[in-house]
Amino acid sequence: MAAGRLFLSRLRAPFSSMAKSPLEGVSSSRGLHAGRGPRRLSIEGNIAVGKSTFVKLLTKTYPEWHVATEPVATWQNIQAAGTQKACTAQSLGNLLDMMYREPARWSYTFQTFSFLSRLKVQLEPFPEKLLQARKPVQIFERSVYSDRYIFAKNLFENGSLSDIEWHIYQDWHSFLLWEFASRITLHGFIYLQASPQVCLKRLYQRAREEEKGIELAYLEQLHGQHEAWLIHKTTKLHFEALMNIPVLVLDVNDDFSEEVTKQEDLMREVNTFVKNL
């Protein structure tokens, strides 16, 4: 128990002092003081479905919104403890690449680290522009929930996580999410839906080095996990707050990176969805 308390204190440490005073200096007639807190959403979808393109489009269309990107760079460059400055950082390796190369060896390590990095992102104090916004909106690129119900769950089902690793991961995941429940609330999911074949084509186009060994079968597995959770509602969930969160499903099978009309349609749907939350 002592070790658990120490772990929690360290996880809270970067945020606790800031979390007590994020509203200082904000007029009581503006921003969060004016009423409800930010509407918080998560963008979900398969590997290479187009999340990065979608995030850029969101940022351009709604600059007043805060969009937190997936911490992929952190996974690609694990730094030794105590070497926070980039110029002196000692890299311990590319964990994302290690996981794809040897999933049976590194999946548990990767999922533990990816979950913690996502949790830290969702625990960050609200940035100034959210505090000043009349209708604040915060959007995350994936969430602590998809970390478990999509990726970790799939790794267990395809044999990359052992029974004991899956049990331990779920235990930590549940404990930490219950501990921080009030600070990681989400109000909606935006599901970018595309076929595994389309995702594979886009994966080849972006040519991320770590992903060159990914096959269609893996993308089909992840597609099935997304559909079960967000469409068919057959995934067994362990958090009551997740049960009734609305889902906006956006068909992104057609390339929208250069198609202005498609972009406008997508942004219009997102705006309507957010307004109704």
From Swiss-Prot:
Record's keyword terms, sorted: Acetylation, ATP-binding, Disease variant, Kinase, Mitochondrion, Neuropathy, Nucleotide-binding, Primary mitochondrial disease, Progressive external ophthalmoplegia, Transferase, Transit peptide
Cellular component per GO? Answer: cytoplasm; cytosol; mitochondrial matrix; mitochondrion; nucleus
Name of the top EC class for this enzyme: transferase
Q: Which residues form a coiled coil?
A: none
Catalysed reactions, as listed in the record:
2'-deoxyguanosine + ATP = dGMP + ADP + H(+); 2'-deoxyadenosine + ATP = dAMP + ADP + H(+)
Annotated consequence of substituting N154K: In PEOB4; decreased protein levels
Primary localization class, coarse: mitochondrion
Q: Does the keyword Lyase apply?
A: no
Tissue distribution is:
Ubiquitous. Highest expression in muscle, brain, liver and lymphoid tissues.
Q: Name the InterPro entries for this protein.
A: DCK/DGK, Deoxyribonucleoside_kinase, DNK_dom, P-loop_NTPase
Question: Where along this sequence does the record place binding of substrate?
Answer: E70, Y100, Q111, R118, R142, D147, E211
A Pfam match: dNK
Q: Point out residues bearing the modification N6-acetyllysine.
A: K275
**Positions of the catalytic residues:** E141
Disulphide bridges: none
User: Where does the UniProt annotation locate this protein?
Assistant: Mitochondrion
EC numbers listed for it are 2.7.1.113, 2.7.1.76
Q: Name one GO biological process term.
A: dGTP metabolic process
Transit peptide limits: 1-39
Listed binding positions for ATP are 45-53, 206-208, 254-256
What subunit structure does UniProt give? Homodimer.
Q: Which family does it belong to?
A: Belongs to the DCK/DGK family.
State what this protein does.
Phosphorylates deoxyguanosine and deoxyadenosine in the mitochondrial matrix, with the highest efficiency for deoxyguanosine. In non-replicating cells, where cytosolic dNTP synthesis is down-regulated, mtDNA synthesis depends solely on DGUOK and TK2. Phosphorylates certain nucleoside analogs. Widely used as target of antiviral and chemotherapeutic agents.
Query: Which protein are we looking at?
Result: Deoxyguanosine kinase, mitochondrial
Q: What species was this sequence derived from? A: Homo sapiens
Query: Its gene?
Result: DGUOK
